[in-house]
Amino acid sequence: MADVLADQLRSATLSDATNNEDWRRNLNIPARDNRQQTEDVTNTKGLEFENFGLKRDLLMGIFEAGFEKPSPIQEESIPVALTGRDILARAKNGTGKTAAFVVPALETINPKVSKIQCLILVPTRELAMQTSQVCKTLGKHLGINVMVTTGGTTLRDDILRLQDPVHIVVGTPGRILDLAGKNVADLSECPMFIMDEADKLLSIEFTPVIEQLLQFHPKDRQVMLFSATFPISVKEFSDKNMTNPYEINLMDELTLRGITQYYAFVEEKQKVHCLNTLFSKLQINQSIIFCNSTNRVELLAKKITELGYSCFYSHAKMQQQARNRVFHDFRNGVCRNLVCSDLLTRGIDIQAVNVVINFDFPKNAETYLHRIGRSGRYGHLGLAINLISWEDRFNLYNIERDLGTEIQPIPSTIDKSLYVYDNPETIPRPINIPAQPSSAGNAQSAAPNQGPPPQQQRPHQGQENWQNQNGRHNGSSQQQQPRGPHQNRGRGGGRGRGGFQGQGQGQRNYNNNYRGGRGGHNQGQHQQQMPNQQS
């Protein structure tokens, strides 16, 4: 079906937008992103956004947001979605799934009708903020009102906002069910029901809420599901609640082609030292570092700050205001490193991130796939480094098997062409998300287009002030000066194939014949052992 539509769209003159190019001359189009892209986003049928017959005002928003040509998932889904058919779409992380459903939603909505006409469900608050901003940016010339609502905010504010016309509601399932159940959000005439990260939304914790939400929609609704992975729960939901869905599967392989994956076998007590070595060796634009528990997130962020690197942290137990601020500031380059739990594995698009580090190795392939997908966004290059302990060796094998990929042992030197661009300052900053009001202090002074500070710059003191509201510092109260190169060097190996050579302070030399599960002794004052991962 999509191939037939593509041929028809390519040959047809669909709107006055294709006949008159004068309107494009006055657009405020951002500088072109000339970074190398992989076939994940370049393997298209040659369609243009103009071929979809979209409103000129929508095309203006698309081009002013920096979009040039549709990606494969956008080519497949947009024309089908515009026909009103249900869709099951599976595509890799970071290949343009959000625009694949936002564009047809914006095209379909009638701004003159003061009713909720599209509901977009996402699993996390950060993804809700990001998706709502994409809707606002692409539809800024359409006069469409977008509302984002999530848990962790007062219900009263949402009730007041719904007194005004709202056309698109983006949010997490629990909060939207509260609003619909109180007859505050009227979904009776909402024809579009969209789920992003559908595999997560159809997990045990969310499925009952999703089923209840569907009852508030009309029977002839259009249901669209988008995700990178489709477990059996998605098929069960589709069979029960979707009508002859059009299935799109662009997952010829599971991992992004632009991401290079490495592992290093490291004893638990040596992980911080290994991370310090990575910071000194890698050319990081921005990095996301994952831990398996909220307690370890805060402790590791504090340790990184003590080592002299700028670092934020984020996890689900933080206050919503602080989470919003972290998300906003990190996206806008205020800080170079972010330590987080799996809270930010879903859909978060920060194109400046070129390195992902699994400080704690994940337990399953699904989590691993979503974590490493935070780098290498939209066909660009990225690096994923996994710190593996002896207990993780079976998870490593299982994930390699399940994903059909091989995670290589980390070499002594990583080729910068695998993840570094010639002019990193030209990397486009993400679509700006307004900051939530807070007493952020000095952190507010960072300009939205400012790149991240040098990797060894001292952290922003203002960050600590506002993140203190979570009960703990995001770093030490007495910042240390950035460390220069040291003479002590270390090596760590992996599965008997190669090793990793690095630098660190207060560490004795590793055994040069180190292989696998043994490592050097911990002599540095900053190499305290992290707590157990189950904490």
UniProtKB/Swiss-Prot annotation:
Cellular component GO terms, alphabetically? P-body
Family recorded in the similarity comment: Belongs to the DEAD box helicase family. DDX6/DHH1 subfamily.
| All copies of domain Helicase ATP-binding, residue ranges | 78-248
InterPro entries in UniProt: DEAD/DEAH_box_helicase_dom, Helicase_ATP-bd, Helicase_C-like, P-loop_NTPase, RNA-helicase_DEAD-box_CS, RNA_helicase_DEAD_Q_motif
Provide the gene name from the record: DHH1
Annotated compartments: Cytoplasm, P-body
Q: Where is this motif: Q motif?
A: 47-75
**What is the recorded name of this protein?**
ATP-dependent RNA helicase DHH1
Q: Where is the composition biased (Gly residues)?
A: 495-505
